[in-house]
């Protein structure tokens, strides 16, 4: 079927992606198709859906935010961890383009879709930063506080405490 064929053809593109051969991952190597061809030749397959995720993450890393948003918006997953990552990447792209409302919305989705001690604090931290940039100081304080209360073993804990204290100090003036 179409999906199995697309997945077989996408194998090499995934390999290139994992090896940081981004150009080959996107456009193929002349023998094997890249992610862009998979999306074009096999639309509405699971493989094309996954290719959208890879393409979006590549474009984001290349600071091509508009295309990153377009491809990531076309991706959806049943796996909560992968979908949360896609929401976080969308948040990053929207933050970079100055669309703070959409950045906040996507970071909220990333942080709340399936809480876990490794990724949720990262997504909450990004959400708090977006709140700060949007001038929503109380929401930022509250979000940093959530990291402080629930994720005290996380990498983000110390920075969240520091930023929360800084914002509380500014708010008190």
Segments the model singles out, each with a brief description of its role:
Residues 39-48, 62, 76-84, 111-120, ...:
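Short solvent-exposed coil/turn linkers within tandem alpha-helical repeat scaffolds
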């Amino acid at each position: 079927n179409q999906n199995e064929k697309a997945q077989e053809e996408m194998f090499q593109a995934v390999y290139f992606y994992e090896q940081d051969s981004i150009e080959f991952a996107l456009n193929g190597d002349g023998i094997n198709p890249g992610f862009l061809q998979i999306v074009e030749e096999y639309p509405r397959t699971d493989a094309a859906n996954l290719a959208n995720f890879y393409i979006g993450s590549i474009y984001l890393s290349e600071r091509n935010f508009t295309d990153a948003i377009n491809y990531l918006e076309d991706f959806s997953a049943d796996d909560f961890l992968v979908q949360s990552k896609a929401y976080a990447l969308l948040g990053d792209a929207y933050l970079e383009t100055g669309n703070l409302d959409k950045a906040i919305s996507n970071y909220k989705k990333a942080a709340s879709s399936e809480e876990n001690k490794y990724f949720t604090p990262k997504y909450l931290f990004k959400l708090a930063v977006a709140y700060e940039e949007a001038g929503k100081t109380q929401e930022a304080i509250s979000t940093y506080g959530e990291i402080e209360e629930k994720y005290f073993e996380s990498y983000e804990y110390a920075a969240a405490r520091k930023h929360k204290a800084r914002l509380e100090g500014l708010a008190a003036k």
